């Protein structure tokens, strides 16, 4: 199983759930049914753990993100970038199995694929501040 790919799919699902208001169960079920690659490459247990973790700690995660924004409001962050920040912040604060550097580097790699270079710098700055707290 590929953790990097699983993290990316967790971000896609979290982003989709933000837009559609689907439940995690519905989103994961639809993902599994429609995934065109080898589903065995995805660690669905990890994906669900991340989605549940972000959902269960969303207020605390958003508070930490907001506290580490400089002259920004969390509402101004694009949904894609916010999904990336939420997953990385969840990993930094709650998932002790993921090294902090890995959580940040993976978030930046996902940002490079789904956003632009300004977003990479922005997310790196926010996560670096969170890591230091």
Curated annotation (Swiss-Prot):
- Gene Ontology terms describing biological process: DNA-templated transcription termination; transcription antitermination
User: Keywords on this record?
Assistant: RNA-binding, Transcription, Transcription antitermination, Transcription regulation
Question: Which GO MF terms does the UniProt record name?
Answer: RNA binding
Q: Where is the signal peptide?
A: none
Q: What are the GO cellular component annotations?
A: cytosol
- Could you name the domain of life of the organism this protein comes from? Bacteria
Name of this chain's protein:
Transcription antitermination protein NusB
Q: What is the source species?
A: Clostridium beijerinckii (strain ATCC 51743 / NCIMB 8052) (Clostridium acetobutylicum)
Gene that codes for this? Answer: nusB
